[in-house]
Design a protein with these regions (language model features):
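Active-site-proximal alpha-helical segments within enzyme catalytic domains
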Residues: 142-146, 184-207, 251-267
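Structured C-terminal helix/loop/strand segments within mature extracytoplasmic catalytic/sensor domains
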Residues: 22, 247-287
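A short, well-structured edge-of-sheet supersecondary motif
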Residues: 4-34, 63, 253-254, 260-264
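Active-site SXXK
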Residues: 24, 39-64, 91, 143-147, ...
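Active-site helix/loop module of the DD-peptidase/beta-lactamase fold
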Residues: 60-98, 122, 151-190
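Active-site Gly/Thr loop motif
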Residues: 218-264
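Catalytic-site signature segments of enzymes, centered on catalytic residues
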Residues: 27-34, 104-186
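Solvent-exposed loop and edge beta-strand segments that line ligand/cofactor-binding
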Residues: 36, 40, 79-82, 128-135, ...
Length: 287
């Protein structure tokens, strides 16, 4: 596959590398510098979604469980009526009900409170859950906390035998909160090739090397657009009926089921929307 047109533009957007697979075969790749593990920022959220999927599959988590039950020991004295209605599913859709985003990157170093679970649940729930899309790190963070509590281990330890080891991803680094819990909303460090394998895993609907590891039903449910917003369970939806893990500065693995393809790239781009449009036009359109 000829991606020379994209490579010319890629330099304008500080793209560090791109990998493209079609029909499970490598179609093209390009790097502006050697591969290394990088912070994939909010693309981490899609790995948290995957962890929730395994936990649901193992009977550890029920998406319909109320947050007041799941976090009964962390609730404020006065429980918001909208919080009473929120479920585990609402943690995954960016429709939790809070008015604005919290636990965001620039905020986290400034918090005096170390218990981010209790801090997250005391934030007012202005909207009825499921009615307003507000990009917010609280949902994926709490989802990750719940997986850790129910499984008894951090997210790296939980995903290693279930996902990472099978994909050949050796013990990655993952940011933690002040109490040592994996931060489910960001801070996972991977190479481009490792991120690309994750995309291939989802393209193949939870299969790896011919073996079904994660339920195909979960893959389909978690990557379709929800009723509110262009978003699944911690996956963005996009053109060509695609879905993607998407992190700050354009750390992306895009899955295109109808084209049987995966396009992954890492960058230091401050113009993410423009870069994404360029990928659609100069890469996806040629697949």
């Amino acid at each position: 596959m000829d991606i020379s047109d994209f490579v010319k533009k890629a330099k304008e957007y500080n793209v560090l590398g791109i990998k493209i697979s079609k029909d499970n075969e490598l179609a093209a790749e390009w790097y502006s510098e050697p591969e290394c593990r990088r912070n994939i920022y909010s693309a981490t959220k899609s790995f948290t979604s995957c962890a929730v999927g395994f936990a649901v599959q193992e009977g550890l988590i029920d998406l319909n469980e109320k947050l007041t039950e799941a976090f009964s020991g962390d609730l404020p004295e006065c429980i918001d009526e909208n919080l009473k209605e929120a479920t585990v599913r609402d943690l995954l859709t960016m429709c939790l009900g809070q008015e604005k985003g919290s636990l965001m990157g620039e905020q986290r170093p400034l918090y005096e409170e170390d218990n981010w679970v209790k801090m997250s649940l005391v934030i007012p729930f202005k909207y009825k859950p499921g009615t307003h899309f507000v990009y917010n790190n609280v949902g994926p963070y709490l989802a990750g906390i719940l997986v850790q509590r129910r499984s008894g281990c951090d997210l790296v330890s939980y995903l290693t035998p279930r996902l990472f080891a099978k994909l050949g991803i050796k013990r990655p680094t993952w940011e933690t909160d002040p109490l040592g819990n994996s931060f489910g909303a960001g801070g996972l460090f991977l190479t481009l090739s490792e991120l690309h394998k994750f995309g291939l895993f989802y393209l193949n609907k939870g299969k790896w090397n011919g073996k079904q590891i994660l339920s195909e039903n979960w893959i389909e449910e978690s990557t379709k657009a929800a009723d509110v917003g262009y978003y699944g369970y911690l996956f963005w939806r996009g053109e060509y009926n695609s879905f993607r893990a998407d992190g700050k500065y354009s750390q992306i693995s895009m899955i295109l089921p109808k084209k049987n393809a995966v396009v992954s790239f890492v960058s230091e781009c401050r113009r993410g929307d423009e870069l994404l449009k360029t990928v659609y036009e100069l890469v996806c359109a040629k697949l």
